[in-house]
Swiss-Prot record:
This is Paraneoplastic antigen Ma2 homolog. Transmembrane segments: none annotated. The keyword DNA damage does not apply. Residues 335-364 are annotated as: Disordered. It comes from Macaca fascicularis. Residues 335-353 have a biased composition (Acidic residues). Keywords: Acetylation, Nucleus. Pfam families: PNMA, PNMA_N. GO terms for cellular component: nucleolus. It is found in: Nucleus, Nucleolus. The lineage of its organism: Eukaryota, Metazoa, Chordata, Craniata, Vertebrata. Residues 354-364 have a biased composition (Gly residues). The keyword Acetylation applies. Coiled coil: none annotated.
Length: 364
């Protein structure tokens, strides 16, 4: 970042970047005379120079200055930092071989990818470029063009690492390395969301983890619907390989869950919601009637006061049942109203309290 700033600044000032320095980290309250005093002392081995300008760098909350060296200087004599008043100032400069190093790294990178610089230019529509002209192009332009090439490259061709799924076959006798279906499905559902590729590539990666009947099912659902999504494929696996017993267990656990002693109705509904969603995921309860089932279970499994019972009964009779948040809002409002009423009852003085409650037996 600092080197790029040096190069841009030199272009603006029309000076040779190989004969220029940039000093950064200078406190903003330093005057030019104070800066010159420090630099003359610390850079005297470089010979004469002139200060071309000063800018403020917001990211450092400090100033930077550009210097032009007026004499030929050995780059090995240029310090990487100088001790200024109030801290260390960084010295940024460009070595003569940095452009060559960049080109070497670029060629090495493209070689590993099976490409060439000329091929990169052709892919971007720059047919006139040849290997002979590449050294004449600035590293900044090459870096920009390389970034374009990476951005336009087909996503599956880019080198990437991805979390692979464990093997699943769906066989009656699973292999020792296989996970139970429920464990595999939970892992697969999470991991496929992380894969930064197209749906087609996701389905290919999913198929790589399948064997036997599971792989056969994958081929069948794709043949029936070539545009099927990965999520729909996993849903098909649930229907075929999912445990029916686990569905019944989820349904019974939900229907047999009641409000516990001392538990608020809102806390019961929140606990119940986790079980309901699990039952819906296992297809033990149809998603389309989840709101209705929730309301009925709350009315059957909770201890409700008369006011809340009437409100819930009204919601059930009048129209579409409330969703989770709507139901929770009704219950919380009733709980707050009931708590407010109880507080008022406690604060209200009972008969015989106050000044009129004194014992006057001693009065005549």
């Amino acid at each position: 970042m600092a080197l790029a700033l040096l190069e841009d600044w030199c272009r603006i000032m029309s000076v040779d970047e190989q004969k220029s320095l940039m000093v950064t980290g200078i406190p903003v309250d330093y005057e030019e005379a104070e800066i010159q005093e420090v630099l003359q002392e610390t850079l005297k081995s470089l010979g004469s120079y002139r200060l071309l300008g000063k800018i403020f760098r917001k990211q450092e909350n400090a100033n930077a200055v550009l210097l032009e060296l007026l004499e030929d200087t050995d780059v090995s004599a240029i310090p990487s930092e100088v001790q200024g008043k109030g801290g260390v100032w960084k010295v940024v400069f460009k070595t003569p071989n940095q452009d060559t190093e960049f080109l070497e790294r670029l060629n090495l990178f493209l070689e590993k990818e099976g490409q060439t610089v000329s091929g990169m230019f052709r892919a971007l529509g720059h047919e006139g470029m040849s290997p002979a002209t590449v050294p004449c192009i600035s590293p900044e332009l090459l870096a920009h063009l390389l970034g374009q090439a990476m951005a336009h490259a087909p996503q599956p061709l880019l080198p990437m690492r991805y979390r692979k799924l464990r093997v699943f076959s769906g066989s009656a006798v699973p292999a020792p390395e296989e996970e139970p279906f429920e464990v595999w499905l939970e892992q697969a559902t999470e991991i496929v969301k992380e894969w930064p590729v197209t749906e087609a590539e996701k389905k290919r990666w999913l198929a790589e983890s399948l064997r036997g009947p599971a792989l056969d099912l994958m081929h069948i659902v794709q043949a029936d619907n070539p545009s099927i999504s990965v999520e729909e494929c996993l849903e098909a696996f649930k229907q075929v390989f999912g445990s029916l017993e686990s569905r019944r267990t989820a349904q019974v656990r939900y229907l047999k869950t009641y409000q516990e002693e001392g538990e608020k109705v809102s806390a019961y509904v929140l606990r119940l919601e986790t079980l309901l969603r699990r039952a819906v995921e296992k297809r033990a309860i149809p998603r389309r009637i989840a709101d209705q089932v929730r309301l009925e279970q709350v009315m059957a499994g909770a201890t409700l006061n008369q006011m809340l019972w009437c409100r819930l009964r009204e919601l059930k009779d009048q129209g579409p049942p409330p969703n989770f948040l709507e139901l929770m809002k009704v219950i919380r409002e009733e709980e707050e109203e009931e708590a407010s009423f109880e507080n008022e009852s406690i604060e209200e003085p009972e008969e015989g309290d106050g000044y009129g409650g004194w014992n006057h037996e001693g009065d005549d």
